[in-house]
Design a protein with these regions (language model features):
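A preference for well-ordered globular domain cores
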Residues: 1-111
Length: 111
């Protein structure tokens, strides 16, 4: 096989592997951002965090109705505690994603 073709195939394989690893890392981060409370599942994202912030900004911290991932209503009775739980989970997972992403970039070397 021609040397340049061999190098090109090797490069393509390394790049494909790297892209697959990044894709898996993103999926893992999304899966880890799931919070279960009161028998309901919430995917923690910036929309949910901002909704809590909005409620807290208008001083509605005692209770509010939220829709879970399955669009079922659930009454959250302590918005501050819920907000602390979701932001903590989100930040831990984002930090883990950051560390693992940087490790992948470091390990990939010269692609």
């Amino acid at each position: 096989m021609d040397e340049s073709l061999s190098k090109s195939l090797e490069y393509a394989e390394r790049l494909s592997t790297f892209n697959n690893q990044i894709k898996l890392l993103k999926e893992q981060c999304l899966e880890n951002n799931i919070l279960y409370t009161q028998g309901h599942q919430f995917t923690v994202d910036l929309n949910l965090i901002n909704y809590c912030l909005t409620l807290m900004n208008i001083k509605k911290t005692n209770e509010a109705i939220f829709l879970d991932d399955y669009k079922l209503p659930v009454k959250i009775t302590d918005i501050n505690s819920f907000y602390n739980n979701i932001t903590d989970l989100y930040q831990r997972n984002l930090n883990q994603y950051f560390v693992e992403y940087n490790q992948l970039v470091k390990d990939k070397g010269e692609i």
